Amino acid sequence: MKEGSSISVAVRVRPFTEREKGLLAETPKSKEFLGDGSLAVSNTSSNTFCTNGIRKIVRVLDDNVLIFDPPEENPLAKVQKSLLPAGKRFRDVRYAFDRLFGEEASQEDVYKGTTEPLLDSVLQGYNATVFAYGATGCGKTHTISGRPDDPGIIFLTMRALLDRVEGLKRTMNVDISVSYLEIYNEKIRDLLVQDPLSMEKPKSLNICEDAEQNVSVPGLSYFTPTNLEEVMEIIIRGNSNRTMSPTEANAVSSRSHAVLQIYITQTPKSGEKQEESESQNSHKVRSVFSFIDLAGSERASATKNRGKRLVEGANINRSLLALGNCINSLCEPRRRQHVPYRDSKLTRLLKFSLGGNCRTCMIVCISPSSEHYDETHNTLKYGNRAKNIKTKVSRNVVSVDRHVSEYVRTIYELRQKVSILQKRIAEESKQLALNKEVRKISSREIKMLDARSMLKNSFDGSRDLQKSLIEHVRTLRRIEDEITLTKMWISIAKESDAMSGHNIKSVETRLAKLYDQRSLITAKVNPEEICKTFQNSISHIVSSFKGEGADMYADMLQDDVDLLKSIIENQILDAKHESETFSSTSRKLIQNLFLLFPLLPGNAIDVNESLARAFDQLVGIVPSEPTIQVPNLIEKGKAPLLSMFEIPRSPSRFKARSPSKAARVLKKPLKKRVRFSEVPTTSSVPPVEIKNKDSKPKVEKSLDKHNMNNDRSFLVPSRDARNSLTSLSLHSNVAKNKSSHSSKWPTHTLSPIITTALKQPVRRISLVSQPLQKTGGTENTPNA
């Protein structure tokens, strides 16, 4: 059984009385149970129509729900104005209760639905109370006491109790005693001690509370019934002594509150062969089963009471008002207000039935007649409130047959157990605290592992973004290199006056476009977007650590994020500085390029097509016309000189990044390189004319060996170029020949800037087929 329990509320609707039946708007043709105290079945029916009748204000829907003041279903009610007061509407209020009994319910049905479930609890040692509540003339006394031919729940309960006691006699000694009292005009009377025929005035009793705050009535008589006949005799005798008188509302009206209590004591039987010992204890189980028949509330105007009856009605209403106040206080425990149990003798007796150690069932008796409209409505409201009352129940077990010395020893043993349990609790508390700290650290370590896994996944997931970022950085570096070279070219072109102003402006336009490209690429180089993904992936874990006060773990995670950020920044720095600056080399290349223009022959000049393409890439101008294929100038045993003029896509071309990198494979085989003969730098070299067309001319130029090794910007004619020059005349002096140069040079193979440069005045040089000897002044032709 649960320690906390609510009051069970059941509603019983009594049938119409003979008088009420005659006042109905339409007399039903079915049998009617009369509610005048006898609840007899009426077979009389009339088809008369009453112009000033009453109506039914309660409709039962099922075992739990009823409707108060439902809409009228009688079609004649529309023409009968007396059924509903003027200006009022039907309330049509629904109430739900634990159990609902209609007009056709019998006493057995009410017993099984209300009292029978409490019988098992009483035998287990729990207190129980059943009381009937309602207005006068609603069937409370009939429900509790009944008649000999139709007994109430008291008789039915005692019958079931005696049957169960017979089954317990094998193991338990069960004692049953009964007391019966009434509260009349706030005075307590014993209903079993007085002779109904005696004219003596009954003695008034008082209410007391013992040390355990149990309510008792000193001087109250107790009877022990052994069979059902004795039980019925007690009930009849008590009802005979109870104060009753007829009123306008009820022909058999109870003028007092009646309380019948059944005291049950159970003691276990000891076996005949059971050894007696000092530690052996026997326990008594005590319980009280109370049945309370409350007097009905009544209105003086309805009952037309005068004199003594009026005083009785006032006292009844006073005690019921105190009961209603107690119910209201118990329904709202949050207010912790005082419950006025002492306002009435009735509430003092019901103190533990309402809010104490007791299981309580409240039977609300109501009338279906519209004559009791307000009383029925108030009764339903109080019953609905009583459902919210909570009670605490416990078994009433008392230990007996124990010597005083055993209590001292028991107390010592209990204290020892308490001390041991306290030590155990302290040790377990320390262990729990340690385990909690260990679990907390373990959970933090798990969070750290999860956070680092998230960081790794975030870093791996940003690989594409990192590659794109590095590519943007390299593109930006390439654009900056192109800008630097272009600015160098413009500066040297302006200093040497080798180019026209139109061409310089074209290059400056290209430089402006490079600036725009650099701005666009610079906007895309934003490592903060990647770093932000690292921070966002673990931000919730960092916040969790800070909320728990684990700043060390939060700082460790932040260090991991900073480490990943530094990796991204280092990748950017590596991409920016992965090649050495080549400003001095590129400047020397451009200077030698401009110095090369005056050295080109006027009518037959072999210019490598790659030189023009390299120059175009240098200034960023794409040739507008297709070029012809001209053999590359390749020095024997060395890399092509043309590669020095190409603008690399990345500065890594100037620096070997990895020894495992594959060597560059030339698409064409190396061709034999012809060198110029060494001649003193202070003397000029006379031209030599080769008349033999079959011989292959060789051109050598005497240069300082040191300058030759340091300055690699000279162009050397290839073997195919020499074959194309055999038909040209070689002269020793330099002559100007603008017209022949412009007419014979294939301008469609070069870019506009180079074409313009070649149109400038140039000096011719003579090519010799044999190297000159410094001594003897004779020429020696080398072997082919």
Curated annotation (Swiss-Prot):
Gene3D superfamilies: Kinesin motor domain (3.40.850.10). Residues 677-715 are annotated as: Disordered. Disruption phenotype: Simultaneous disruption of dam1 is lethal and leads to the cut phenotype (septation without chromosome segregation). GO terms for biological process: cell division; deactivation of mitotic spindle assembly checkpoint; microtubule depolymerization; microtubule-based movement; mitotic chromosome movement towards spindle pole; mitotic metaphase chromosome recapture; mitotic sister chromatid biorientation; mitotic sister chromatid segregation. GO terms for molecular function: ATP binding; ATP hydrolysis activity; microtubule binding; plus-end-directed microtubule motor activity. Pfam families: Kinesin. ATP binds at residues 134-141. PANTHER family: CENTROMERE PROTEIN E, KINESIN-LIKE PROTEIN KIF19 ISOFORM X1. Heterodimer with klp5. This is Kinesin-like protein 6. It comes from Schizosaccharomyces pombe (strain 972 / ATCC 24843). The gene is klp6.
